[in-house]
Swiss-Prot record:
Cofactors required: Mg(2+)
Subunit structure: Homodimer.
UniProt binding sites for Mg(2+) 1: 409, 416
Source organism of this protein record: Trichormus variabilis (strain ATCC 29413 / PCC 7937)
Keyword terms: Aminoacyl-tRNA synthetase, ATP-binding, Cytoplasm, Ligase, Magnesium, Metal-binding, Nucleotide-binding, Protein biosynthesis
Protein name listed in UniProt: Lysine--tRNA ligase
Family: Belongs to the class-II aminoacyl-tRNA synthetase family.
Catalytic activity, as annotated: tRNA(Lys) + L-lysine + ATP = L-lysyl-tRNA(Lys) + AMP + diphosphate
Gene Ontology BP annotations: lysyl-tRNA aminoacylation
Localization in the cell: Cytoplasm
EC category name: ligase
Coiled-coil zones: none
Length: 561
């Protein structure tokens, strides 16, 4: 049967249930146990043994085996599965007053996917299956759409993400991933709160962007008549709190960056930023080790983990090594020895490092060498320390190494997991760096930071020595759940709309008709479209964006296929 036929048949069952006086969409149900509790409580029950303990449970029917006077259902709730043992005489006797033909209605009007409540006693069948020996049942929710086939199930990865609710129903391991995510974030908060850190919420809508080099999402406030930005980091507002007298603050929340999508990047993601007065980046390294090892031990019960076939030992202390030393170790290039930019470029080209021609400083080339030749090799937890000042506009100058800053990034399985500074507290130095960033922004660098005058004013009131730390929650969850893609650990990741990309279009000037074909195969014809619109579409840098803004909903149309 097609999905449409199945849905039609189930709608008929909905009407039959209503005619029987049964509401197929119940208001509530009171359970006494979950499946896992019953499996644990009666684990020692022997085959053929019964107990008189009355239980009530609810869950989704995941399998049905129906015979003449007997039926076996597999019921699944959030914790696991248990079998329902359904015997005609027992059900008819128990439900005689409410439904004289209850057993047959159960057989005829329920389907895999329905949500059922059941009451009964406990028995273990002769085949050894712990079961609820059902006395009464209630259809709590009648499903209309069929679940994916057990063996050929939900294998389309994009569809799994797009219909996460179905993914969660049919793949218990996906539910486990999100349970662990919740345990990880709760564990991080608990660790910090036990050490007197205070979580304070900062604005998501901001009049200035800052705290990271990233392209923001832009929106508009109609009443205030001003552009606003979705935050790209929580850093600058948390630092204002340090200026204001708080000594230990953090925020775990969403940030937004209008950038690419990949297995490691989602435009909307979760991070935690932590700031501690009178601390430096060495203190932040200790804090990072403490947070991650404590959470891993609490959630997984071990510090020896496997990620995509790689064995990772999270046991502290973790390796600490400078970016210069790592680049020298993997490339042979000693960036301390280069006296000129051209010397650094020439040596780096010979070492096979791409992109050096565009680099304007030796520090930028050092970072390119690190990203190209080193990063992927850092499987075990490694603190990469002492970065070039050119790529770290918010970090304090290194106390003994000119041209460097006191910054570290934590790499695990070749992936940046945390970032930290001894924070820059000199307002004059900070202004100079932000003005340099603003100049890059004015020159067309969409990721460069602007000058946040209010933040600079705050610094001029005086910010104590401060250590700052950011941890990517999604990447940490990926690590601790052995998930290959960031989309596997975000419940509802951002996806391109189905069938929304323009494959090709044609314009007939005599009739002012614009015919558009989309990647889904759909073809639409738009009428009375001026030639100027077609010409603007031709020249638009993003044809999809132009279509949604100036064509869709603006002209009458007909769907051709």
């Amino acid at each position: 049967m097609s999905e449409e036929d199945i849905r039609a048949a189930r709608l008929e069952k909905v009407e039959q249930l209503k005619q029987l006086g049964t509401n197929p969409y119940a208001y509530r149900w009171e359970s006494t146990h979950h499946a896992a509790q019953l499996q644990e409580k009666f684990a020692d029950l022997t085959s053929g043994e019964e107990v008189d303990t009355e239980v009530a449970i609810a869950g989704r029917i995941m399998a049905r085996r129906v015979f003449g006077k007997l039926a076996f259902f597999t019921l699944e709730d959030e914790t696991g599965t248990i079998q329902l043992y359904l015997e005609k005489n027992r059900i008819q006797e128990s439900m005689a007053e409410t439904d004289a033909d209850a057993f047959n209605h159960l057989k005829q009007l329920t389907d895999v996917g329905d949500i059922l409540g059941a009451k009964g006693t406990i028995k273990r069948t002769e085949k050894g299956e712990l079961s609820i020996y059902v006395k009464e049942y209630t259809i709590l929710t009648k499903s209309l759409l069929p679940l994916p086939d057990k063996w050929h199930g939900l294998t389309d990865v994009a569809k799994r993400y797009r219909q996460r609710y179905v993914d969660l129903i049919v793949n218990p391991e996906v539910r486990q991933t999100f349970r662990r995510r919740a345990q990880i974030t709760a564990g991080i908060r608990r660790y910090l709160e036990q050490r007197d850190f205070l979580e304070i919420e900062t604005p998501v809508l901001q009049s200035e962007t800052g705290g990271a080099d990233a392209r923001p999402f832009i929106t508009y406030h109609n009443t205030l008549e001003m552009e606003l930005y979705l935050r790209i980091a929580t850093e600058l507002h948390l630092k204002r709190l340090i200026v204001g007298g708080f000594e230990k603050v953090f925020e775990l929340g969403r940030v937004f960056r209008n950038e690419g999508i990949s297995t490691r990047h989602n435009p909307e993601f979760t991070s935690i930023e932590i700031y501690q007065a009178y601390a430096d980046y060495n203190d932040m390294m200790a804090l990072t080790e403490g947070i991650i090892t404590t959470v891993a031990q609490d959630v997984l019960g071990t510090l020896q983990i496997t990620y995509q076939g790689e064995t990772v030992d999270l046991t502290p202390p973790w390796r600490r090594v400078t970016m210069h030393d790592l680049v020298k170790e993997y490339t042979g290039l000693d960036f301390h020895s280069f006296q000129t930019l051209e010397e650094a470029k020439s040596a780096s080209k010979n070492a096979g490092i791409p992109g050096v021609d565009e680099a304007q400083t030796i520090g930028k080339i050092l970072n390119l060498a690190f990203e190209e030749k080193v990063e992927a090799n850092l499987i075990q937890p490694t603190f990469v320390i002492d970065y070039p000042v050119e790529i770290s506009p918010l970090a304090k100058p290194h106390r003994s190494q000119p041209g460097l800053v006191e910054r570290f990034e934590l790499f695990i399985v070749g992936r940046e997991t945390a970032n930290s500074f001894s924070e820059l507290t000199d307002p004059i130095d900070q202004r100079e760096r932000l003005e340099a960033q603003a100049a890059k922004k004015a020159a067309g660098d969409l990721e460069a930071q602007g000058v946040d005058e209010d933040f600079l004013t705050a610094l001029e009131y005086g910010m104590p020595p401060t250590g700052g730390l950011g941890i990517g929650i999604d990447r940490l969850v990926m690590l601790l759940t052995d998930s290959a893609s960031i989309r596997d650990v975000i419940a509802f990741p951002l996806l391109k709309p189905e069938g929304s990309f323009i494959k090709e279009y044609r314009y007939e000037s005599t009739t002012q008709t614009l015919t558009m074909e989309f990647d889904s195969g759909s073809v639409y014809e738009y009428f009375k479209v001026p030639l100027t619109v077609k010409e603007e579409l031709d020249n638009a840098p993003s044809k999809g964006q132009y279509f949604h803004k100036f064509i869709k909903g603006k002209f009458k149309y007909e769907q051709l296929s």
